[in-house]
A protein has these predicted regions:
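Class I SAM-dependent methyltransferase SAM/SAH-binding core
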Residues: 51-53, 57-107
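Conserved alpha-helix/loop element of class I SAM-dependent methyltransferases that forms part
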Residues: 27-46
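A short acidic, Gly/Pro-enriched loop at the edge of an enzyme's catalytic core
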Residues: 106-117
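Short alpha-helix
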Residues: 172-187
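A short glycine-rich, Lys/Arg-flanked "PGG" loop and its adjoining helix->strand segment in the class I
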Residues: 131-145
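Conserved Class I S-adenosyl-L-methionine
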Residues: 192-259
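Short, glycine-/aromatic-enriched active-site segment of Class I SAM-dependent methyltransferases
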Residues: 151-170
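A short SAM/SAH-binding and catalytic strip from SAM-dependent methyltransferases
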Residues: 117-130
């Protein structure tokens, strides 16, 4: 299999974790965008229960914790990410109400109608946008909120190179109108949608990825598989520079409604 045809899913979880653990965020985003999404949510008190699903090392979670009351549980499949998450919470003095646990987003450790807010930045694709919306809904209280960022097509047609790349990486990627329709279908009332600005990719994701690559390549010097993985990250960056008018990330904020 050529490197051009590989996706992140073709590599060992340990390699993926080692690479991205050196980054504050494991996908496009920024503190400003996190807070913008949060501004559309009005149901939170010091009794609120919040879950950040696919939290990574918790960059966005710590931003949330600094601006909302309540208890926050971060969930991620990678123990290495959760170790960093909990260390960051302790360093910020948030450990009494912010904790990270190892778990899978397709088997969440919550009761039905337990959560006031489900948050997930750049992670719902791991289970699929539509599946995540449907399966996670039951954990929300009536009137609870979901806030997720997800990759979106901005046009119905796009060049074959970028279309083929994303069809290999994430075939469920869809256009904005279709994604909003999926929110309705899953039992949510869309409250706000907005496209993440370019600096969420260039300054807050790609720039930190360069530093992470240097650490990663030194650690895995001579490891061909690790070198292939590192090269794939560069391909993603280059494609965004060429085709950013055709796709990006969108934040979706929605409220659970009775069906």
């Amino acid at each position: 299999m050529s490197n051009e045809n590989k996706t992140i899913h073709d590599f060992e979880l340990k390699l993926i974790c080692d690479f991205f653990s050196n980054m504050e965020r494991q996908g496009p985003g920024s503190p400003d965008v996190t807070l913008k999404a949060l501004s559309f949510i009005d149901n939170l008190t010091d009794k609120s229960l919040i879950a950040d699903i696919g939290c990574g090392t918790g960059g966005q979670t710590m931003v949330l914790a600094g601006h909302v009351p309540g208890q926050i549980t971060g969930i991620d499949l990678f123990p290495g990410f959760i170790d960093i998450f909990n260390r960051n919470a302790r360093q910020l003095g948030l450990q009494d109400r912010v904790k990270g646990i190892v778990g899978s987003m397709d088997n969440l450790p919550f009761q039905n109608e337990e959560l006031d807010l489900i948050w997930s930045e750049g992670a719902i694709y791991n289970i699929g946008f539509e599946r995540g919306l449907n399966e996670w809904r039951r954990y929300l209280k009536p009137g609870g909120y979901i806030a997720v960022s997800e990759s979106s097509w901005f046009t119905d047609e796009r060049p074959a190179e970028i279309n083929d790349f994303w069809m290999d990486a994430y075939s469920e990627m869809d256009t904005l109108p279709n994604q909003v329709a999926k929110l309705y279908k899953a039992g949510y009332l869309p409250v706000a949608t907005f496209i993440l600005p370019e600096n969420c990719w260039t300054e807050h994701y790609f720039a930190s990825k360069v530093a992470a690559q240097e650490i990663f390549r030194k650690k895995y010097a001579g490891n061909k598989i690790a070198e292939e993985f590192s090269s794939l990250q560069m391909i993603e960056d280059e494609l965004y520079g060429k085709y950013k008018e055709f796709y990006g990330y969108t934040f979706f904020i929605a409220k659970k409604i009775e069906q």
